[in-house]
Amino acid sequence: MNLLLSFVILAFGTAVFGLPLTSKRATICNGRAELCSRSYGNTTFLGSHNSYAVSTDIFAVGRNQEVSITAQLDLGVRFLQAQAHQWEGNLRFCHTSCILFDGGLVVDYLKKVKSWLDAHPNEVLTLLVTNPDNVSLRDVWKPAFDSSGVTPLTYVPPTNPMKRGDWPTLGSLIDSGKRVIVFMDSGADGAGVDFILPQFKMIWEPPFSSTDPNFPCSVDRNEGPLSVTDHMHMLNHNLNVNIIPIGDGVLVADRANAARTNSVSSIMANAGGCAPLAAGKAPNFVMLDWVNVGEGMKAVNMLNGFA
């Protein structure tokens, strides 16, 4: 009877969440004991927009951050967003053009992330990579993840897409060793690379590149078959300023007002504006420029129910 019970428990844990059961159990998850029993789909994470675009040069118009990837993670960022392009035969993190801002090789970026994860074994991290050139997942993206050592840490859900309410707990992800969730905006069809998940089938976004500090909310990008309320959602809480208001204009990240944009009051107002579209749920990801400025982590703690 005991053998049968053990078999049932093992099968249940593997089948429901796609996670192997281990004897250890995390007691602190993403810095909080309370988060160990919290579903990934019911947790809010601090995010970094164009996380690779790091510079303190005020004339670097393509910058969005001013502290390193490691420093961002040390500040509490657990959602890293980055856009990639094939340039000069290599996959590099760049936005629009690598001439405008070259964030370096994707594999080098991932190696930095892997080093940080190795030093912080009780952390769940999400990566959102955008793939406007539709670079091959199997031939280009997967080798970068493999070479960096990140692939063994990636989580593959038992169903794709996965409903917001069906995700495992942070504790389960950490205990399993599968604590990196990877989403991609375009080209993630699962063919041969099952750990790169289609973003818009599981996460919806409000409009991006906002120049309005009120961040009016609407469902701007998502895909079926899941309902909007079965999606997770993120806040594109990064403000832009039009520096050449002619034609389509030229938008750059608004550093001058970063403290106001990244304040608790601004973030909470944005979250409140999107909540009616998400069945009253808090956002899963709060994506900011200039994560070292303002009160991003304080707002995320509040959204997670911690005063």
Whereabouts are the PLM-identified features?
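Fungal secretory targeting signals
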Residues: 1-25
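Catalytic cores of phosphodiester-bond hydrolases, prominently lipid phosphodiesterases
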Residues: 19-307
